Amino acid sequence: MKFTLDWLKSHLDTDATLEQIEVGLTAIGLEVEGIDDPSKHLGGFVVGHILEAEKHPDADKLKLCKVDSGAGILQVVCGAPNARAGLKVILAQPGTYIPITGDVLKKGKVRGVESQGMMCSWRELKLGEDHDGIAELDVTLAVGASLLDIMSFDPMIEISVTPNRVDCLGVRGIARDLAAFGLGNLKPLKVEPVPGAFKSSIGVRLEFAPEDSNACPLFAGRLIRGVKNGDSPQWLKDRLTAIGLRPISALVDITNFFAYDLCRPLHVFDAAKVKGDIRARLARDGETLAGLNGKTYTLESGMTVIADENGPEALAGILGGEHSGCTEATTEVFLEAAYFDPIRTAATGRKLDILSDARFRFERGVDPAFVVPSMELATRMILDLCGGEASEAVIAGTEPDWQKSIVLRPNRVAELGGVEVSTQRMETILNDLGCAVAEHADGLLVNPPSWRGDITAEHDLVEEVIRINGYDNIPATPMPRPAMPKPVLTPGQRRSGWVRRQLATRGLVETVTWSFLPEAQAVMFGGGAPEMHLANPISSDLDVMRPSVLPNLVTAAGRNADRGMKDLGLFELGPQFDGPEPGQQRLVAAGIRAGRARGRHWADPARAVDAFDAKADILSAVAAAGANPDSLQVVAEAPVWYHPGRSGTLKLGNKPVGFFGEIHPGLLAKLDVKGPVAGFELFLEALPAQKAKATKAKPLLKASALQPLDRDFAFTLDTGVAADAVVRAARNADKVLISDVAVFDLYEGDKMAAGKKSLAITVTLQPTDKTLTDEDIEAVGAKIVAAVAKATGGELRG
């Protein structure tokens, strides 16, 4: 929205400076996008006097002029047809900024003759569109006077208007807001009905079906005859030119002026070209309209038009028609003022791709109560500027219902806006904005004005109070510090996080692989059942839900080995699918190690990964999950995809909770992966739940000051007895003194009886309160021997 300072002051009685108005506009939500003050660029121009104007010696259309600048005589080459001796002109001397080009004037030669200045047109100063010749000034002006001293320049202000503030698409609406803000007083708008001198020969009708009556609920007009459609007065031209509009003729300029001055689009028809009455109706499919913009439009049903007996003459609220447009020869006009439905107007404009000043206002909802008053004001201006006489007004329809009553509770201003405003101040603000305010049991009863259709509820009134009271008056309040949020992770999610961190700590790299795989691989790992096939796989070789996480990890190791990464460790936490029904999926922590566990080194030989690496990984994951690894049994059995002699199962009672070991060499060959590869699978949901909360602090570490001591035991056992059974039996012999048990030797040979083996363990004793005597040590040793014998049948070797 553009307007000039003088234009604003025609509605606002104020002594505020341009800077104060700029600040005030932004403060009330009408953001200033720019201010164009012509005087900033016109300080170098002076009044010049042409003393001589002779023909250029080398150009027929150029003149060689002697111009008095007040400080000396300059030679100026000029091509303007009206350049002549005795003329007072606007003179630019070298070093002057030229607004139209943005250049600084320099001396130069034109067809071999030096030109020491430039005589300017209004267009070159961006003060108008006239560029047919140089500007002609009053001959009484003093030569050498600054242009700033002889002319007044009106700054142009451009603001950004939000879609809900259609009232501020008129200068009066902006002035009203500034007056409410305290930057002056709103001047009264006097609407005096124009008495009709005769009855209009053109009537108005509304021809809508009942369901379409909202398209145009009110249509008013009047016939004005004997008009003279000449040029507009200079003040009107200046205002339109300042905001970028081109003055056309008095009648057209008046309608454009009302659109920007009072946010009331109007239209004038050449009455001599209108046949019969003017009616508002819906268009018929296939009708056409030649618009004032030079384009022809094919109309559709549902579009509102203004028509006569011959057909459409205008698109309602959007564009006038060329046929009934006014020209210099027009002597009789019909003035139209109406209210058109915003939704239909917007839909028609979008459909036909027309964006006009009228559409821009009507589709946002202009003042429905200002139809007839605007017609009276426009009639008076036409009579004043164009002469003639007006008929009696003709009106069809009624004013649409716009009245609303809203209760404003004063405390809501503080609750929603965060600022304390007195009830009296609220009432003053709302009254200044045009609202009718009365007392109410709950606070204030407010009736918004007709031009504020955007005020529909209490919160809108709160916004108006806060806006006019000043956003700067809202105290700065820091945001409340949020409390420490409570943990939202489930126990299972926390357990997964602990395991994930532990495996990463052990050097394994986390991966995320597909939850499906080729059927052939699924079969190798105990899956591939028909019910596990995908109905719509993303790829033909990813057609089965995975029965294990290991296949994807093993094949990933193979791809890495092909690219030179032969030694690596991978892990993944994700589901494996045992069946298609809910509850037939298990959360698994799986991992693999491939290649060498330890690289080449001068002190230690390289070593390939083996089942014990996988066992260490799975036991560390068990501990990280909050379970006690010592409570699990290791059984020398595993699924078929593990090496039959280098694998094992972790059991809790009779329930498997995980597998570990080297991957079967035959399976690796089928997958084209070079071994060895060791892996593990831990079923997290099968582990016992923690007895203590994860956030519970660990007990204080009490390190014993007494020296530990080791005792070795060798047992003769049946070859089928697992070493783990011996270790568990020895550890449980005395849980207070025994801190660790480890296997350090295994012998099966000629010196042992058939079906027998020798297993040696070392037991670490850690006293806590006193040094152990020989008797204490012997007693613990006896307990260990007895416990192993009872659990495994083993005998202590001599």
Curated annotation (Swiss-Prot):
Q: What Pfam families does UniProt report for this protein, alphabetically?
A: B3_4, B5, FDX-ACB, tRNA_bind, tRNA_synthFbeta
The record's section on SMART domains has: B3_4 (SM00873), B5 (SM00874), FDX-ACB (SM00896)
- What Gene Ontology terms for biological process does this UniProt record contain? phenylalanyl-tRNA aminoacylation
Instruction: Output the Gene3D superfamilies linked to this UniProt entry.
Output: 3.30.56.10, Bira Bifunctional Protein, Domain 2, Ferrodoxin-fold anticodon-binding domain, Nucleic acid-binding proteins, Phenylalanyl-trna Synthetase, Chain B, domain 3
Q: How is the cofactor bound?
A: Binds 2 magnesium ions per tetramer.
Q: Which residues form the B5 domain?
A: 401-476
Q: Chief localization class?
A: cytoplasm
A molecular function annotated in GO for this UniProt entry is: magnesium ion binding
Highest rank taxon of the organism: Bacteria
EC number(s) from the headed UniProt entry:
6.1.1.20
Instruction: Work out whether the entry's keyword set contains Cell wall biogenesis/degradation.
Output: no
Describe its partners and assembly state: Tetramer of two alpha and two beta subunits.
Q: Which family does it belong to?
A: Belongs to the phenylalanyl-tRNA synthetase beta subunit family. Type 1 subfamily.
Q: Tell me what this protein is called.
A: Phenylalanine--tRNA ligase beta subunit
